[in-house]
């Protein structure tokens, strides 16, 4: 049975409880609301509203406290139908703009440096664990390749992909080759493969070079090695994390076992990356100011160790490819601030990566 929609009074009380709890981390009582929130309601009336919200699962009463705390259901309703997303404040804008501006102006930032910087700034501003995923490369367009012969049987291959990412691989050859042969193969590969996606290259490289395979030993080696050369970068190599210290300082992590579980989770980088990559909108009601931001709360997360956490993420785009920015923290999170920071950071990151590259 679906829950009924809340009336205005219930929405107001639920919103106040969540906002107060986010700030204080302490259960919120009816007396606090009556005295501080100017709703024009008596303490008794507010208690009745809170009782209804508790009966329907939006708030709960921890142990013997007279106050109430939000549940996952309460946070979900708040995010979808009550939350107001304010703009990033001037101080935060200055910090973000200065950090990215320096990388762009000095032209000293590689894509990796920009992504790591984004993770550090996002963690510092959100006071949560921040995660940045570089774009997946399966649908990235191959631009050009270069080969540098390190010895007669050792070669460095440099791939340029959509002017965004340079992928470098050192390969041990099973044959001896000359610089002249390398130069000819580079020209041929760039002529035949430029403009294709990495996925297309992996699937069709044998066919596209079939007329060259009979007597071109280096071409044969490239075809045999296509899975390594043009493969998707493993997701853990696309992951940048910062801000773990901000999380363990929060009240939710006072118990050592909570800290231990959290550290264990973030040490499993594959799981963290997948949590952010797979994060999606869990409600059909999309808040207009959320844009492409996805929020999964508590037990909506697939990982058991993330059942007490919220994941907020948004995509960023560069060169037709999509990466992701994410924040992981306790469900007691300033959701409006998280959304506004992610939206602004995504715009800045897209612009900076385009300029740096």
Curated annotation (Swiss-Prot):
Molecular functions (GO terms): DNA binding
SUPFAM superfamilies according to UniProt: GAF domain-like (SSF55781), Winged helix' DNA-binding domain (SSF46785)
GO biological process, one term: negative regulation of DNA-templated transcription
Keyword rRNA processing: no
UniProt-listed InterPro entries: GAF-like_dom_sf, HrcA, HrcA_C, WH-like_DNA-bd_sf, WH_DNA-bd_sf, WHTH_transcript_rep_HrcA_IDD
Family affiliation: Belongs to the HrcA family.
Role: Negative regulator of class I heat shock genes (grpE-dnaK-dnaJ and groELS operons). Prevents heat-shock induction of these operons.
Name used for this protein in its record: Heat-inducible transcription repressor HrcA
Source species taxonomy: Bacteria, Pseudomonadati, Chlorobiota, Chlorobiia, Chlorobiales
Gene (name only): hrcA
């Amino acid at each position: 049975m679906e829950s009924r929609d809340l009336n205005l009074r219930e929405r107001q009380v639920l919103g106040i409880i969540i906002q107060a709890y986010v700030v204080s981390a302490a259960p919120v009582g009816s007396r606090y609301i009556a005295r501080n929130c100017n709703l024009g309601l008596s303490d008794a009336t507010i208690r009745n509203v809170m009782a209804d919200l508790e009966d329907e699962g939006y708030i709960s009463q921890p142990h013997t406290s007279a106050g109430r705390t939000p549940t996952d259901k309460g946070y979900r309703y708040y995010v979808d139908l009550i939350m107001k997303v304010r703009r990033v404040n001037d101080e935060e804008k200055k910090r973000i703009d200065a950090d990215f501006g320096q990388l762009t102006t000095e032209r000293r930032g590689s894509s990796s440096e920009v992504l790591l910087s984004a993770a550090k700034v996002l963690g510092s501003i959100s006071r949560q664990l921040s995660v940045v995923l570089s774009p997946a490369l399966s649908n990235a367009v191959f631009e050009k390749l270069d080969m540098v012969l390190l010895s007669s049987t050792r070669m460095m291959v440099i791939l340029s992909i959509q002017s965004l990412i340079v992928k470098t691989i050192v390969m041990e050859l099973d044959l001896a080759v000359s610089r002249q042969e390398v130069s000819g193969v580079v020209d041929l590969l760039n002529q035949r493969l430029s403009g294709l996606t990495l996925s297309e290259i992996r699937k069709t490289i044998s066919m596209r070079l079939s007329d060259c395979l009979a007597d071109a030993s280096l071409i044969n080696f490239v075809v045999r090695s296509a899975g390594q050369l043009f493969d998707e970068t493993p997701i853990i190599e696309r992951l940048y994390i910062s801000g773990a210290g901000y999380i363990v300082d929060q009240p939710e992590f006072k118990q050592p076992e909570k800290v231990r579980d959290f550290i264990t989770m973030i040490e499993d980088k594959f799981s963290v990356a997948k949590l952010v990559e797979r994060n999606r909108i869990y409600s059909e009601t999309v808040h207009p100011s959320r844009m492409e931001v996805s929020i999964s709360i508590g037990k909506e997360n697939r990982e058991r160790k993330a059942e007490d956490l919220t994941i907020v993420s948004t995509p960023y785009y560069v060169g037709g490819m999509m990466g992701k920015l994410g924040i992981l923290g306790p469900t007691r999170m300033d959701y409006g601030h998280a959304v506004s920071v992610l939206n602004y950071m995504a715009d800045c990151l897209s612009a900076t990566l385009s300029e740096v590259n």
